[in-house]
Regions:
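Bacterial signal peptide processing site
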Residues: 34-37
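Active-site-adjacent structural segments surrounding the nucleophilic cysteine of cysteine proteases
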Residues: 51-178
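Bacterial N-terminal signal peptides that target proteins for export
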Residues: 3-21
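Active-site signature of cysteine proteases
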Residues: 230-303
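Extracellular glycoprotein-like low-complexity segments
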Residues: 309-391
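Conserved active-site-adjacent core of cysteine acyl-enzyme catalytic domains
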Residues: 153-234, 256
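C-terminal motif of bacterial Sec signal peptides marking the signal peptidase cleavage site
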Residues: 29-32
Length: 391
């Protein structure tokens, strides 16, 4: 969708009703974002980044480690061809029995029966109206792929946080309902408040700082996923090493869109920017590069994904037209489609002209307390979420 096609909602400066907000849940045209062995056992994050940054040293030989040129700053030992999934990221529901779809059980696992089921009754669980709506929206978002889930779960297997049941992750295959549901679960954690908060905080740091934090964390045995964004699209990958080269740094990654292939994100130290030249494909089949600076690269620590999570939207819509009792309304937009346009043409404006959403191909946020999030799927349709304060 082009910027001049943006949908706009004008609301009062004090209150936005839930019924009005939910009317914005729609499908619009958007672009595709791309086409367990030894390792640390902790899933913590670095508390004092200034302290650990000083400890990062790049002295090992990258060629000897099979990591190209330069010096090794960090290497946790994860390698595509053994620790990645043998199958690529996939879109939508492909199993004949629908076993790879998003389920009520997964939502209960995230938030608990007390939040998801009517009267908190788990067996049998009758989903609340907002739970039913969430399942429908997240099921639609699966049409854009499961990059966040595959990036997270492959690393959890490697770090020993979860057990794959095989000698090496690469031995797993699909269809495999239990594996697919596990991937869906970790994919959906990107939408919970705790994970969104950690990711958003990391995006306030510049690429060089994040790279040094990553190197320190990998050296300490910590687990992270990387999120990258370009023109409103999002993709998630698994970092496993950092090397130092003349121009800056290289982050070595497993991209679940390309199993069995080690890829890299380049960090230009002087410009303080990042570039990933194999994120997607142009219509002619040639690679399409993504790039960015502060605000478009994120690190999400594994410890942010510890359930159960707080469900900030679960009591929305108790009565028709009412606003949420937890302080804000969530507007979700499933977006997917053609190549080359912003990921979502959603723009919300207050009566006094403050905006949040995509304007002119750029994400803007002029509403205090509002949060704009682009889901990471890796293949197309994604879930765009806007949280709006009601007071």
């Amino acid at each position: 969708m082009r910027p001049d096609d943006n949908h706009s909602l004008t609301a009062g400066s004090r209150r936005l009703t839930l019924a009005t907000a939910l009317a914005l849940v729609m499908v619009v045209t958007a672009a595709a974002c791309g086409g367990s062995s030894s390792g640390g056992s902790t899933d913590g994050s670095i508390d004092d980044s200034s302290e650990v940054l000083a400890e990062v040293e790049c002295t090992g030989s990258a060629p000897e480690a099979g990591l190209g040129e330069g010096q090794v700053c960090a290497d946790n030992g994860f390698r595509p061809t053994s620790d990645d999934f043998s199958f690529p990221n996939w879109a939508g529901v492909q199993d004949q029995d629908g076993g790879d779809g998003f389920t009520l059980d997964t939502l209960v696992r995230l938030y608990g029966a007390s939040e998801v089921c009517v009267d908190g009754i788990a067996d049998p669980c009758a989903p609340t109206p907002i739970a039913t709506q969430t399942i429908e929206q997240w099921s639609g978002a699966l049409a854009g792929g499961r990059c966040e889930g595959m990036a997270t779960l492959s690393l959890r297997y490697y770090l020993g946080l979860d057990q794959s049941g095989v000698a090496a992750t690469v031995e797993l295959s699909r269809p495999n309902v239990s594996l697919e549901q596990e991937i869906n679960y970790w994919w959906s954690t990107q939408f919970v408040d705790e994970v969104k908060a950690q990711a958003a905080e990391s995006r306030t740091n510049d690429p060089v700082t994040l790279t040094k934090q990553l190197a320190a964390g990998l050296t300490a045995g910590l687990g992270y996923t990387i999120g990258i964004y370009d023109e409103g699209f999002g993709h998630a990958v698994t970092p496993f090493a950092v090397t130092k080269v003349d121009s800056g740094y290289v982050i070595h990654i497993y991209d679940n869109n390309a199993p069995g292939e080690a890829r890299t994100i380049s960090i230009d130290e002087a410009a303080n920017t990042w570039t990933y030249d194999k994120t997607a494909e142009n219509p002619d089949g040639t690679p399409a590069a993504w790039s960015g600076s502060t605000g478009t690269l994120e690190l999400t620590p594994m410890n942010a994904r510890s359930a159960p999570f707080a469900c900030s939207f679960c009591d929305q819509g108790d009565s028709e037209g009412s606003a949420t009792t937890k302080g804000y309304v969530t507007v979700n937009l499933a977006a997917g489609g053609s190549t080359g346009d912003p990921a979502a043409g959603l723009l919300i404006a207050t009566a006094d002209g403050r905006r949040v959403g995509v304007a002119g191909g750029v994400v803007v946020n002029e509403i205090a307390g509002a949060v704009y999030t682009v889901g990471k799927g890796g293949l197309g349709t994604s879930l765009v979420s806007v949280e709006l304060p009601v007071n």
